[in-house]
């Protein structure tokens, strides 16, 4: 009788690893065989320079299986205490409609998509973002809006920068209302320091004492007061300065829009439009301006254009403003945004419609009026005369007793100095909330009845002169999907227009579109993580603290750094935060004159944009013919900079997709001249477990948790870009004015609105590392294997532009299409669009080298999917040969006409190739056809005829 396997033999500690990796062991071996290799070890020996290799297992706890990891994280979550938080300050309770929760936030068709650079396969989320822009335009009363920024505080900093760019005033002074949210003031102070702006934080009544280029005003202000801003705005305009207004989006349903008051820029958070507080984020900021500032506005703008058949099509407009084009001359270093959260907010508006939204706002205001009336009758002094949802109270010596009573009732109030308290009501509040507040503030024997107060004619807290009279959201999209059936189908219709990871590989170079495992995603909607206000007392967030501290320890083990700053909520913000730490470090050593930042010519566009934001001068270091940093040019420029050298920004592996042999020497050159090394973490997926940035010589590096550590891209955000630093830089990273962080110097300003950035998505990365453990190195190795497998099989058709040692690439490779374009006129864009007909998202176009495609397959794609991509690319190469041989006209062939749509086959087909060749060019497309929603979009038309609001329905006819 055969012996049954024992429990120890049946234990499967690497079950998740096998789920995460695309190719199984046999497929990996087949791929290695095709490369002439016997093992992954041999591949790594041939690829990664021996001098930087880790050569030991990562110091991480053993991998947990999915259920064990979820159980452990649940244990952390249960240590968070979810109280009724009425702290306000830009964060409010909200109710996410379940149809949106299930079909958007929990749907990989929405959260695994990439930024819509390829509009033909992104029309669904482009429409959702256009709705978001329309929502912003209507509520703010301005003409132009972008498709979201990272948070309200960074939006304020962007508003200040825009004001300086466009204001005719010659002043270098920017005014900030002292009654803005404190986190906003801190982020603006941080940004002003980098730009060299003078900043005045004062009462708005003193604005007229100053000559400024702009001012930041809050409406309603942080204490709830609603002020008529017209006199202040008129004064600013008289001195050719800009008025930038931070507004509460829900209040604008009842308040006169700031644009009607004369504001030039309006921004705020869309968080209370259905996005949980999440201990600080992620949330989509709204940002609107006058149309005349369209070339200066930061972030993505979704515009209306036409496709090749003349039909309405959407696209990202005016991209020449952005960092990937303009580099150090860009308006901003903004790279990602908060698309997934902007979509949720826009769908919240679509689902509720104008009347539903108004009802929510009116209900919040009515509850606040009832509360205010009851308190007033009991002699509680209210410090803000007018209000929407926020009351600031002077309770004098009763403050301590009231705080204790609130704690007993599990209610968080805003605790202010001088015997004052603040409270903000929200959508999640009801009559019971107000009754509990009466008990807390007045004692149980107050004798007030909510019903009796509600039956009275209570005065509005909004002054009559500031009550909204203009209509909003009249477009049909906001008035047609109010039943759940209609909303469900609308969401599905939009989703079907887009291509995401749930349909096929997205081989975008430098983007790391790997698996976002379901087990990693589940915890983000747990109430214990989703419903915490970022400014609750730390004892209510013990679970978050334990999870974040453990994640920081793991990231230190992975990177070799001594400390982690979790605050940056994007990779570009991480760059900025790291460079600020370097700047403060030099200043602490009386070397504040070090302001030259060396950047290789191949760098991401965010690098020079971030450097100029941190107050540095950018000097470009050339690359040699092999794509590596020119060491002699680096030495010469470092020597020339001398005592002015601040740092080098370098990406590793390089943006050219190779492990540079001289990286350690490059770091030594910088250190020899007194500089610091900033390592861009965009390509960390090729380092984890194989090498560590700090060991290589980096002093600081950001980690894209939305690339390497599995936070999904969300169609263009959210992201997280925490930085790792060596010990000497640790005191100089960001702190926070509301929730001080242990470690950094107390005087350090914030770079994001919340202390730990977008904290509610950190469980995703925690889960990934917990389930992979030391075997994270396997992911890096398989990613490198997949890239070399593609390079090997495609190099005969499309030359691989750069290779490293032994002709190997790192985790991505650049295919050079320039010779083919010169010979045939077929461009990299034509190939990108043709790939859509094969059911693929294109690789990264023309970065870092124009006329090329950069391909990154990641470790998560199966051999079958890699082979399908290879087959598609080789088939496209054969199509190019047909053009080259004259069998198809140069301008009328499947590549120039790509992508093909349903409209093409329902119309008259008069083309030199068959419908089958155009529509279903391979076996996969015959069985699993993905239809692009529109034909090729006309980029030039869209920029020349900028239109960034919802399209009239008749335009689709």
From Swiss-Prot:
Q: What does the record give as the reaction this protein catalyses?
A: N(6)-[(R)-lipoyl]-L-lysyl-[glycine-cleavage complex H protein] + glycine + H(+) = N(6)-[(R)-S(8)-aminomethyldihydrolipoyl]-L-lysyl-[glycine-cleavage complex H protein] + CO2
Q: Which cofactor does it need?
A: pyridoxal 5'-phosphate
| Alphabetical list of InterPro entries matching this protein | GcvP (IPR003437), GDC-P_C (IPR049316), GDC-P_N (IPR049315), GDC_P (IPR020581), PyrdxlP-dep_Trfase (IPR015424), PyrdxlP-dep_Trfase_major (IPR015421), PyrdxlP-dep_Trfase_small (IPR015422)
GO biological process terms, semicolon-separated: glycine decarboxylation via glycine cleavage system
Gene3D superfamilies named among the record's database cross-references: Aspartate Aminotransferase, domain 1, Type I PLP-dependent aspartate aminotransferase-like (Major domain)
Pfam families in alphabetical order: GcvP2_C (PF21478), GDC-P (PF02347)
Q: Which CDD domains is this protein grouped with?
A: GDC-P
> How is the quaternary structure described?
The glycine cleavage system is composed of four proteins: P, T, L and H.
This one is known as Glycine dehydrogenase (decarboxylating) 2
Protein's organism: Pseudomonas fluorescens (strain Pf0-1)
The UniProt gene name for this protein comes to gcvP2
């Amino acid at each position: 009788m055969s012996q049954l396997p024992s429990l120890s033999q049946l234990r499967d500690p690497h079950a998740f690893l096998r789920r995460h990796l695309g190719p199984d062991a046999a497929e990996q071996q087949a791929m290695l065989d095709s490369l002439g290799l016997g093992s992954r070890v041999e591949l790594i020996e041939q690829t990664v320079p021996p001098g930087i290799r880790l050569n030991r297992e990562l110091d991480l706890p053993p991998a947990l299986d999915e259920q064990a990891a979820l159980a452990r994280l649940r244990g952390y979550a249960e240590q968070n205490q979810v109280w009724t938080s009425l702290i306000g300050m830009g964060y409010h309770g909200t109710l996410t409609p379940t149809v949106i929760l299930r079909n958007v936030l929990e749907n990989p068709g929405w959260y695994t998509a990439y930024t819509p650079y390829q509009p033909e396969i992104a029309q669904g989320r482009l429409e959702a973002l256009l709705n978001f822009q329309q929502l912003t335009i209507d509520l703010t009363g301005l003409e132009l809006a972008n498709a979201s920024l990272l948070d309200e505080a960074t939006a304020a900093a962007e508003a200040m920068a825009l004001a300086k760019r466009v204001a005719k005033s010659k002043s270098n002074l920017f005014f900030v209302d002292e009654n803005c949210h404190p986190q906003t003031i801190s982020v603006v102070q941080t940004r002003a320091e980098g730009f060299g702006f003078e900043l005045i934080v004062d009462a708005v009544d003193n604005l007229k004492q100053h000559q400024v280029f702009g001012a930041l005003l809050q409406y309603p202000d942080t204490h709830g007061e609603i002020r008529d801003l017209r006199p202040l705005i008129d004064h600013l305009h008289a001195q050719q300065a800009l008025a930038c207004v931070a507004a509460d989006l829900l209040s604008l349903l009842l308040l006169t829009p700031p644009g009607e008051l004369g504001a030039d820029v309006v921004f705020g958070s869309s968080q209370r439009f259905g996005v949980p507080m999440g201990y600080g984020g992620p949330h989509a900021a709204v940002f609107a301006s006058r149309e005349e500032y369209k070339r200066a506005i930061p972030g993505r703008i979704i515009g209306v254009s036409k496709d090749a058949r003349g039909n309405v099509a959407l696209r990202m407009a005016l991209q020449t403003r952005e960092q990937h084009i303009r580099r150090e001359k860009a308006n901003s270093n903004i790279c990602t945004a908060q698309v997934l959260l902007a979509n949720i907010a826009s769908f919240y508006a679509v689902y509720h419609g104008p009347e539903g939204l108004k009802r929510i706002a009116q209900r919040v205001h009515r509850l606040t009026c009832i509360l205010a009336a009851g308190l007033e009758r009991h002699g509680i002094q209210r410090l803000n005369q007018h209000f929407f949802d926020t009351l600031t109270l002077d309770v004098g010596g009763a403050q301590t007793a009231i705080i204790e009573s609130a704690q007993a009732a599990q209610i968080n109030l805003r605790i202010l100095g001088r015997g004052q308290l603040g409270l903000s009501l929200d959508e999640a509040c009801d009559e019971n909330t107000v009754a509990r507040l009466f008990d807390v503030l007045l004692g149980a024997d107050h004798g007030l009845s909510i019903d009796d107060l509600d039956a009275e004619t209570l005065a509005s807290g909004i002054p009559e002169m500031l009550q909204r009279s203009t209509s909003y959201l009249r477009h049909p999209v906001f008035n047609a999907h109010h039943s759940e059936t209609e909303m469900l189908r609308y969401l599905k219709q939009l989703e079907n227009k887009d291509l995401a990871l749930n349909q096929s590989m997205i081989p975008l170079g430098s983007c790391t579109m790997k698996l976002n495992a379901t087990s990693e995603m589940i915890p983000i909607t747990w109430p214990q993580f989703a419903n915490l206000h970022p400014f609750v007392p730390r004892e209510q967030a013990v679970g978050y603290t334990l999870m974040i501290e453990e994640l920081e320890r793991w990231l230190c083990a992975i990177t070799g750094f001594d400390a982690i700053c979790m605050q940056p909520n994007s990779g570009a913000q991480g760059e900025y935060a790291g460079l600020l730490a370097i700047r403060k470090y030099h200043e602490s050593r009386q070397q504040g004159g070090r302001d030259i930042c060396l950047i290789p010519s191949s760098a991401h566009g965010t690098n020079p944009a971030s450097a100029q934001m941190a107050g540095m001068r950018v000097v470009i270091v050339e690359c040699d013919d092999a794509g590596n940093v020119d060491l002699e040019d680096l030495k010469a420029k470092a020597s020339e900079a001398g005592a002015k050298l601040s740092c080098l920004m370098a990406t590793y592996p390089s943006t050219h997709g190779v492990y540079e042999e001289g990286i350690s020497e490059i770091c030594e050159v910088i250190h020899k001249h007194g500089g610091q090394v900033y390592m861009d973490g965009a390509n960390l997926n090729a380092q984890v477990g194989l090498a560590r940035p700090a060991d290589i010589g980096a002093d600081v590096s950001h980690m894209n948790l939305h690339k390497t550590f599995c936070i999904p891209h969300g169609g263009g955000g959210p992201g997280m870009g925490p930085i790792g630093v060596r010990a000497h830089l640790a005191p100089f990273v960001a702190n926070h004015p509301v929730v001080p962080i242990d470690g950094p110097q107390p005087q350090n300003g914030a770079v994001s609105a919340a202390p730990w950035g977008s904290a509610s998505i950190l469980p995703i990365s925690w889960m990934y590392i917990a389930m992979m453990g030391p075997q994270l190195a396997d992911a890096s190795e398989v990613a490198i294997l997949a890239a070399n497998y593609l390079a090997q099989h495609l190099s005969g058709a499309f030359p691989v532009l750069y290779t490293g040692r032994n002709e190997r690439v790192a985790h991505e490779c650049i295919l050079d299409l320039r010779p083919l374009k010169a010979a045939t006129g077929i461009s990299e864009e034509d190939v990108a669009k043709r790939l859509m007909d094969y059911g693929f998202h294109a690789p990264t176009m023309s970065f870092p080298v124009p006329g090329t495609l950069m391909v990154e397959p990641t470790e998560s794609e199966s051999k079958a999917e890699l082979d399908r991509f290879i087959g598609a690319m080789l088939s496209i190469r054969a199509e190019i040969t047909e053009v080259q041989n004259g069998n198809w006209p140069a301008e009328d062939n499947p590549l120039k006409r790509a992508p093909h749509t349903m409209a093409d086959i329902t119309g008259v087909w008069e083309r030199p190739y068959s419908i089958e060749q155009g529509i279903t060019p391979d076996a996969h497309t015959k069985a699993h056809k993905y239809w692009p929603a529109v034909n090729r979009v006309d980029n030039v038309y869209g920029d020349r005829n900028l239109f960034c609001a919802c399209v009239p329905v008749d335009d689709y006819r």
